[in-house]
Every structure is written in structure tokens, then in C-alpha cells.
């Protein structure tokens, strides 16, 4: 086991604080509308330019092991805030730095660290309650666009795009961000249920100019099995041909004789058919087939529940207004499913989301909800160069997380004002002893730090502006972008309550632990030179063979 380097008391805390400051100083230059970019060197490819706090934090590793421990703990603050709300990472880092700096000063002055931590925790619990009182619901497109704009570094086109996307697919809909091919940002909305499976044979194509298949008012056969024998399909095909409608077959697979016969029938115009594989694998495939069945008012033909293909009738088939199939995707538009049944299915999947433990499962279930409930919107980010594209895509993703958080828990006045109002409301809070009172003061002072940092980044005098904002009431604050005072909510400067709350809670949680640190232990650096000499001495062993 390697020898350890151990530091105690003030020595340990000074080292830790130095690491905290290096990381926080690198992150906090990005805060606010006039925050700057940080350039990150990559071991391969071109450097990345970012204004995203958590991206900067993740890149920082320090040479000194004790300083690095301090930096890594603050990195954890940024990561936790990012995981919880998807934004607010820089705010969380600034809050943590302030609590740690002020807290360690109090420890050096002889206060009890445990009571300081209790005081900080009391203040944060009270402040979170105040934030909830200050919060207003975020329901209309205008507010959503404003939240998106602020989070995307005052880029109003991004805010507008996100608001449009949410309007089209609903607040629960899936919105994804992709790299576009042009210079302009674009919004693509896929109405209806889309899944990533294309046609099984190009001979089904009936729109050669687009290389796709379009079926108007088709019947939809859903089979949870491989279909290779045409005989078991004949009754259904005959019934569909009599009805004079096209047929879409969604099955585990359609192969061999069955596929060949379907192709021949289609080419001769006897019956218009298209076949695609069912989406997903294993249990997820069964669930998605059931989703399609609910959407189209059909029945999944599965031997598990005693249904056979030979005995399938038109009543078992689903229906939709239109189906479009190309090489890679199938879109079912306007299924005839009963609205109540669809909502019931959505509620069932939502319950599974609550119970899901892995992020991957949650994401897949969320996609299923969106496909049933509204549709999928894709924001395609446009830029002139790859470096700009990556930076912009990261900003759009941040803005999207922020708007989702705003819809979830509402919004408060932005620009650090909400924290100042919350701090003012709990200024009379008292702890059980004097040390706890100092802890409360540390937290209250820290709650001013995001506003101060926004002002510093805008090149103004922090104390003057902070005092003027503190003297105001409600959502009165300072707009660093236009350099004027006013009602932040009226000016459209909004922060999601969830983002502000998460930033404060995670910053206080980790900063409180760091204040109570009395000893730090790390591995001593190994003397590689000595190790090499030892290994070199073994060279003579070869002669022993």
C-alpha cells in the first residue's frame, strides 16, 4: 500500500480553498449575459469553446493533490446541479465558493464548524421555502421563450425555437437537439408516431420520386412473431383485398415465401401491402407494439395470449389516416385509437417512469409517452464552423433543460434577484447559538454572490448595484445586458425556480461538508526513478533459464 500524505487543520483547509478558488474562478467568468467564454484544450481535435459552467468544471484537474480534492468537491456541486435541473451549474459553483470562503474565515476565527454547518442548513431550508413562495407558474409561450433566451446567453432565436417546439409537441413531448447542415437553426416536427424501422423490401415503394411508401387509410396488422408462411396470412389478405384498402404489416420479421408473395401481390396491384419490422427488442418491442395497438385501435396478434394469424379478422386490425414509410423510418399519422385508451396507456407509462431506476430506461419511456401523446420535435442547430456548432449545441441543450425545469416548478425573477429577496425575507432567522447565527449570515451573504458576479462580468461595480437592488422590492433588479434597473419579470429575465433551488441546495450541502473538514489524506507521489532502477536490476534474470 502506498504511503500517505496527511494534512491537518488550517494547513489542509488553506490548500482545499486554493483548489476551490482555481476551479470556481475558471467557471464563474461564464456567468450572466456578459459572461465570457472558456477555451478547453482537447487531447485530439480542435479546442472547444464553451460558456457552460459544468463543461469547464469537468475539464479541471490540478497537480497538487490537496488542491485537487477541493476542486473536485466543487466540481461535484456543478455536476449535481446539472443532473437535477440541467442548468444553473455556474450559479451553484459561485454559491459554493462564497459559502466555503466565508465559512472557513469563521472557522479560522474560532467558530465551531458543526454549528456553522447547522446554521447554513437552516438558512437554506428557509430560503428554499421563500423561493417557492416567490415562484410563478410558467405556462405561456412567451415566458418559455424568455427562459430559453436567458439560459442560451441572451440568444432570442434559441428561446423562440424552444417555445415553438413546446407549442407543437406539448410540454411533455420529446424535443431533441441535433447538429444541422446549414447556417440557420431549424425546427423539424414529426407529428404522429414515428419509429426507426424502414420497409423490408424496396418493391413496396409507391412514391419513387421520394423513395417512400405512402398508404392512405390503411389497415394495420400487428404481429408479435416472425411471418414466413403465407398460408397463415391468406384469410387477412383476402379480407383486406375485399375491403379495398391498403395493409401495413408490423411484425418481428417478414421473410421468405411470405415476403415474396406480398411483393408479387403489390406489384400486380391485387392488394397494396407494405411490411416493416416491429421497433425495439425483447420486452421493449412487445410494449411498443402494444403502444401502436392503442394508438390505432388494433390488437397485437400474439400466441402468448392465444391469438393466431389464421383466425385474424378485420376487427383485430388497427387503422390510421395515413402511413409514410421510407428506408429508415415509419410514421403513423392520426391513428383511430380511442383518446381515453391512449391517455390511460400514457398514464401507465408515466407510472413506469416514476419507478424506473436507470436514466436510459427513463429516456426510452419518455420517448414512448411523447410518441403517444404528441410527437417529436428536432431542433437542428446551424453554424459556420464545427467549433461554433459544438458551443451553440451545448447552449441550446442547456436552454432546453432550463425551460423544462421552468414548466415543472415555475419561474422566479432572474439575474440573482430571487436569491436576494429570499435572503431578505429570512434576515431575521435565528439559530440555537451564536455560531449557528454566524452560519446563517454566511449563507445570506453567499446568496448575494450570483448577482455580484453577474455585475462584475458586465464590468460594473458590484457593491453599488447590489445595494441598490437590495433596497428595491419584489422583482426589481439590474439588467446587466442593457445596463438598466427595472422589473426583471417585465423585462423577461426569468430563472426557473428548480434551477435556483437546486443550485442553492447542492452548493450548501457540499460547502457545509468542506467547512467541517479537519484532516485530508492523499497518496504521496511515487518516486518513479527509484522504481525504474529496481526493475532495471532484474535484467540479468534472463541468464538463469
Swiss-Prot record:
Residues engaged in binding ATP: 30-33, 51, 87-91, 415, 495
Reaction it catalyzes: ATP + H2O + a folded polypeptide = ADP + phosphate + an unfolded polypeptide
GO molecular function, a single term: unfolded protein binding
Keyword Transport: no
Keywords: ATP-binding, Chaperone, Cytoplasm, Isomerase, Nucleotide-binding
Cellular component aspect of the GO annotation: cytoplasm
SUPFAM superfamilies: GroEL apical domain-like, GroEL equatorial domain-like, GroEL-intermediate domain like
Subcellular location: Cytoplasm
EC code(s) of this entry: 5.6.1.7
Primary location recorded for the protein, binned into one broad class: cytoplasm
Listed InterPro entries: Chaperonin_Cpn60_CS, Cpn60/GroEL, Cpn60/GroEL/TCP-1, GroEL-like_apical_dom_sf, GROEL-like_equatorial_sf, TCP-1-like_intermed_sf
CDD domains: GroEL
GO biological process, one term: protein refolding
UniProt enzyme class: isomerase
Highest rank taxon of the organism: Bacteria
Family, per entry: Belongs to the chaperonin (HSP60) family.
Purpose of the protein: Together with its co-chaperonin GroES, plays an essential role in assisting protein folding. The GroEL-GroES system forms a nano-cage that allows encapsulation of the non-native substrate proteins and provides a physical environment optimized to promote and accelerate protein folding.
Summary of subunit composition and partner proteins: Forms a cylinder of 14 subunits composed of two heptameric rings stacked back-to-back. Interacts with the co-chaperonin GroES.
Name this protein carries in UniProt: Chaperonin GroEL
Originating species: Yersinia pestis bv. Antiqua (strain Antiqua)
Amino acid at each position: 500500500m502506498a504511503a500517505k500524505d496527511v494534512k491537518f487543520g488550517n494547513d489542509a483547509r488553506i490548500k482545499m480553498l486554493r483548489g476551490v478558488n482555481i476551479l470556481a474562478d475558471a467557471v464563474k467568468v461564464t456567468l450572466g449575459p456578459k459572461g465570457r467564454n472558456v477555451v478547453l484544450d482537447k487531447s485530439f481535435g480542435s479546442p472547444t469553446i464553451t460558456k457552460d459552467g459544468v463543461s469547464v468544471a469537468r475539464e479541471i484537474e490540478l497537480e497538487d493533490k490537496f488542491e485537487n480534492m477541493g476542486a473536485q468537491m466543487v466540481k461535484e456541486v456543478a455536476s449535481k446541479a446539472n443532473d437535477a435541473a440541467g442548468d444553473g451549474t455556474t450559479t451553484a459553483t459561485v454559491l459554493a465558493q462564497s459559502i466555503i470562503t466565508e465559512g472557513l474565515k469563521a472557522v479560522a476565527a474560532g467558530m465551531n464548524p458543526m454549528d456553522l454547518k447547522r446554521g447554513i442548513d437552516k438558512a437554506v431550508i428557509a430560503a428554499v421555502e421563500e423561493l417557492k413562495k416567490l415562484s410563478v407558474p410558467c405556462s405561456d409561450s412567451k415566458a418559455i421563450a424568455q427562459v430559453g433566451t436567458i439560459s442560451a446567453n441572451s440568444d432570442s432565436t434559441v428561446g423562440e425555437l424552444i417555445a415553438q417546439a413546446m407549442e407543437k409537441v406539448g410540454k411533455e413531448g420529446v424535443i431533441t437537439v441535433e447538429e444541422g447542415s446549414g447556417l440557420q437553426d431549424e425546427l423539424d416536427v414529426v407529428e404522429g408516431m414515428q419509429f426507426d424501422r424502414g420497409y423490408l423490401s424496396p418493391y413496396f415503394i409507391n412514391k419513387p420520386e421520394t423513395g417512400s411508401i405512402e398508404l392512405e387509410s390503411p389497415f394495420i396488422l400487428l404481429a408479435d412473431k416472425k411471418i414466413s408462411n403465407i398460408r397463415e396470412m391468406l384469410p387477412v389478405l383476402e379480407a383486406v383485398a375485399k375491403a379495398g384498402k391498403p395493409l401495413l404489416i408490423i411484425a418481428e420479421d417478414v421473410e421468405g415465401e411470405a415476403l415474396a408473395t406480398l411483393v408479387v401481390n403489390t406489384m400486380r396491384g391485387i392488394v397494396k401491402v407494405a411490411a416493416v419490422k416491429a421497433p425495439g427488442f425483447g420486452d421493449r418491442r412487445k410494449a411498443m407494439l402494444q403502444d401502436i395497438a392503442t394508438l390505432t385501435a388494433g390488437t397485437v396478434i400474439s400466441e402468448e395470449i392465444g391469438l393466431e394469424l389464421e383466425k385474424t379478422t378485420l376487427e383485430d386490425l388497427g387503422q390510421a389516416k395515413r402511413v409514410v414509410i421510407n428506408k429508415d423510418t415509419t410514421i403513423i399519422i392520426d391513428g383511430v385509437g380511442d383518446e381515453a385508451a391512449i391517455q390511460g396507456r400514457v398514464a401507465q407509462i408515466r407510472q413506469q417512469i416514476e419507478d424506473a431506476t436507470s436514466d436510459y430506461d427513463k429516456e426510452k419511456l419518455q420517448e414512448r409517452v411523447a410518441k403517444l401523446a404528441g410527437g417529436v420535435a428536432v431542433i437542428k442547430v446551424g453554424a459556420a464552423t464545427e467549433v461554433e456548432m459544438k458551443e451553440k449545441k451545448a447552449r441550446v441543450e442547456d436552454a432546453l433543460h432550463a425551460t423544462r425545469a421552468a414548466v415543472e416548478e415555475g419561474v422566479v425573477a432572474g439575474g440573482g434577484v430571487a436569491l436576494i429577496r429570499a435572503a431578505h425575507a429570512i434576515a431575521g432567522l435565528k439559530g440555537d447559538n451564536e455560531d449557528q447565527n454566524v452560519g446563517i449570515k454566511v449563507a445570506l451573504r453567499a446568496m448575494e454572490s450570483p448577482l455580484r458576479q453577474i455585475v462584475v462580468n458586465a464590468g460594473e461595480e458590484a457593491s453599488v448595484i447590489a445595494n441598490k437592488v437590495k433596497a428595491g422590492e419584489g422583482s426589481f433588479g439590474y439588467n446587466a445586458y442593457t445596463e438598466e434597473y427595472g422589473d426583471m419579470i417585465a423585462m423577461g429575465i426569468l430563472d426557473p425556480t428548480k434551477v435556483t433551488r437546486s443550485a442553492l441546495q447542492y452548493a450548501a450541502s457540499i460547502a457545509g461538508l468542506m467547512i467541517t473538514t479537519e484532516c485530508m489524506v492523499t497518496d504521496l507521489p511515487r518516486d518513479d526513478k527509484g522504481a525504474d532502477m529496481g526493475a532495471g536490476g532484474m535484467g540479468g534474470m534472463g541468464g538463469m533459464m
